Amino acid sequence: MMRIAVGLEYRGVGFCGWQSQPQACGVQDAVEKAVSAIAGEAITVTAAGRTDTGVHAALQIVHFDTTSVRPLTAWVRGVNSHLPAGVAVLWAREVDAEFHARFAAFERGYRYVLLNHPVRPGLNAGLVGWHHRPLDVACMNRAASPLIGRHDFSAFRAAECQARSPVKELRRALIERRGDYLLCDFRADGFLHHMVRNLMGCLVQIGAGGRPPEWLHEVLAGRDRTRAAPTFEAAGLYLTHIRYPARFALPESSERWPFA
């Protein structure tokens, strides 16, 4: 028995999120079907994170166990030949049995790509978020700065979130303008369900002048989801960054997507 780690990228459009579904519409369903075809046996994969419907991954890392001996290229090119458009294997590595795609990760990162332009996206529809009014990036960064550190993020937690604790350590919250796009980066030891999209909803209100920067810290301190802004759309959210202990020697990000 050997354990294989695989790096993936995918568009969330057209899938019911990452997790396997009874109607087989999850990205996981497509990946397991393709890997099983190459392995010649039923394969179950475990992912670093479970993205929601419409959320993308510039890098998702999964592992699986198999008795089938294949060259690593088979787990890349062979699996890709069985995957639908919008999903691709980037690389494959053999890892030891101690590696676990979910539990061995000690940091994850998301990037929200937001088109800030009066006209809605056409070519990038479904791949970026959108806000039509000018956004003040400096105000958004001032608002986000006090969130860095270990806090109770209950105010940004979805009602259906299954995390045991709302306390997370946010290590990065940084917004950068690149032409008409805002690239909004978040890194933490873990994320609550809808946490990034709920933060984005608040930051966009602040950037548009609807709220002062101090409001975001007040929402955080209040720990009340009803005091925060509505959840922002899924379209612009990407899983981008997964860190493991150095001994596993796995890439922690991908530079090949256009918003890297």
UniProtKB/Swiss-Prot annotation:
Q: Name one GO biological process term.
A: tRNA pseudouridine synthesis
Which positions bind substrate? Y110
User: What residues sit in the active site?
Assistant: D52 (nucleophile)
State a single Pfam family of this protein: PseudoU_synth_1
Keyword Isomerase (UniProt): yes
Quaternary state and partners of this protein?
A: Homodimer.
Q: Which purpose does this protein serve, as stated in its record?
A: Formation of pseudouridine at positions 38, 39 and 40 in the anticodon stem and loop of transfer RNAs.
Indicate what this protein is called per its UniProt record.
Answer: tRNA pseudouridine synthase A
